[in-house]
């Protein structure tokens, strides 16, 4: 079994160069990211009883599954976290590595999925943001992802609801309301 949906990987590989274009194909994520980052940061601080200093996540190890070009990995790194970002698209990983290096960030990007990740540690926090709608087997994805989480760790999973109403709200919300 695996979680990789080859059609989704091909689709995202074709648009990998767009990740850091705030007006490109990932514009809704760029608009929504500040809200996501604050929510994640605040919940990590609360869960692990951290000080909200300049680098509040400096003691936290994060695994960002389906990291794409690093839109969430980079802010988590800037907040002090030690970040490993994984994505099944080699092109996404190349974009993420290039952008992190350009911004002098130390993020370990690996072309992998949760079931094939060869890493000997477990993580305080796992991020699976806007990824489950792109995997082959959601239950297997959740199982394999949670095996990488430390006991009493924190896992964030988010996806768009697959209804017309939620799609319209997400697009309209990201495009107009979050300006």
Please place each PLM-identified region on the residue numbering.
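N-terminal, positively charged/glycine-rich alpha-helical extensions of SAM-dependent methyltransferases
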Residues: 1-26
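Soluble or luminal CAZymes and related metallo-dependent hydrolases
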Residues: 4, 32, 36, 137
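Conserved SAM-binding loop and adjacent beta-strand
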Residues: 22-47
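A C-terminal cap/extension of S-adenosyl-L-methionine-dependent methyltransferases
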Residues: 26-29, 103, 109, 177-178
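Conserved SAM-binding loop
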Residues: 47, 51-167
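Short, glycine-/aromatic-enriched active-site segment of Class I SAM-dependent methyltransferases
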Residues: 164-179
